[in-house]
């Protein structure tokens, strides 16, 4: 078993690093700022990919792949875009032993290289919409990195769509941010707040950015997904026009949207504990571990354990047996708790005689007795569903407990380390920047979730907590990853 994990209350950041490495999810590489995603971590990403990919295809999207290298002239075509990304870019200046005629940027995001192609593919309204997604790696030269959360190279998906009208583009933006919200809540068991970013926080080159924000156990916010309305900015930069039904030549409307492997970091920080990883069953590659208690006639116990695993796998439950004799049952219990296996079955000679076994839940540690009969798969499925639901409800309860409405700047400063703060803002970049400078808190989201808007009166006018000027709405402030 791995070394002891630092307790969350002792050092939350160290707890996170210890857990990621001890559970063999990821490790540091010899390339500064880059990480190695180990098999346990990559298995989670594959589960995420499979679920998201199915959701993308169900909404009419198809996958493609575009080059890793982007000509410098492309990057410079969209002024806001290059201003936002230039400091983070890695640039290739030489190839084949010679200096390149034009520098190539290693993909920080793909809007420019994709829109250079869309210009060639789009002539008429009949060519629209284009609904393409790409699974890829990107590079952003980060100064301060943290496994999964912020690394120089990371994996993600990026959707890039082209539309005939502004209305269609906005519908796409909202469709995809709601796909992300559904994925976060139904698969990750992660409650999120959906809404719009401020002008200063939006994506470089976007007209507006929509996002989902989640609360981690240290009460900081984590941006879990974004969807951008790019307007006609990239179409104009690349002169991408089409002939409308009326025969007019018009610029195309665009969107882009993406999530990345930082979702694995969100998963860890939202649910895990001092014993290790806690995974929602829908994203667990291995859902059930069966541990034989090897006393007396061990062959009969092992045979029964393997039979149970085979039956569960046949019914769509990912089960496996650890019948190795190199480690004690207690060691195995701790090891699989560390790895986040949702359910543990303990099986000994007496259990076989009574046709029962003990099931332990990873989320609560609660144990129960299950019947070893034809209903076993149903019993396990009920447990898995209960764990999935409990993780969501637990995270939601935590967020609600640590979301506070404040009406003054002194109250704001006194509580900014305690979670999400709901407060009036005057809508100016200046006030937003001053609050960030003084408290390190940012406006995470202008919520659009009806329940939250109603609960906190988000759309009610008031007075800005910082400037004292009139405010048309409340927003959510927090410190963030």
Swiss-Prot record:
Cellular compartments annotated: Cytoplasm
Keyword terms: Aminoacyl-tRNA synthetase, ATP-binding, Cytoplasm, Ligase, Nucleotide-binding, Protein biosynthesis
Any one of the GO CC terms: cytoplasm
SUPFAM superfamilies for the chain: C-terminal domain of ProRS (SSF64586), Class II aaRS ABD-related (SSF52954), Class II aaRS and biotin synthetases (SSF55681)
UniProt keyword annotation of Lipid biosynthesis present: no
Catalytic activity: tRNA(Pro) + L-proline + ATP = L-prolyl-tRNA(Pro) + AMP + diphosphate
Gene3D superfamilies documented for this protein: Anticodon-binding domain, Bira Bifunctional Protein, Domain 2, C-terminal domain of ProRS
A GO biological process held by the record: prolyl-tRNA aminoacylation
Positions in coiled-coil regions: none
Top-level taxon: Bacteria
Family: Belongs to the class-II aminoacyl-tRNA synthetase family. ProS type 3 subfamily.
Subunit field text: Homodimer.
Entry note about domains: Consists of three domains: the N-terminal catalytic domain, the anticodon-binding domain and the C-terminal extension.
Protein name, UniProt field: Proline--tRNA ligase
UniProt organism field: Prosthecochloris aestuarii (strain DSM 271 / SK 413)
Organism lineage string: Bacteria, Pseudomonadati, Chlorobiota, Chlorobiia, Chlorobiales
